[in-house]
Amino acid sequence: MTVAEAAKVLGLTVLCGDDSREIEGVYVGDLLSRCMSRVTEGCLWITIMSNINAVAVAALTDPACIVFCEDVEIEEDMLQRARENDITIAKSTLDAYALCVAFHNSCGEKS
């Protein structure tokens, strides 16, 4: 499933980046030091930690997309840094659990 397909199914708003990337897994985490060693290339990273350091972690780990859940505010400077580093950012009003359940259900037999 691509980021664009996930956005459609999950009701995500893609704010910047390449939504054609394939999603190869999911990681949920907010502690950025932990995320640096757990977010994997191509994953959908779900978090509420909407600060510019999340973009730095994504630049190191290369997820398909960072999804900021619970409708957290995303500052323009963070979006600008994401654009500069080719990081895809989306947001959702759902919480992390609801996003994971919806993503799992959308995968059907592939999960």
Regions found by a protein language model. Give the residues of each.
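N-terminal first-folded block
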Residues: 3-43
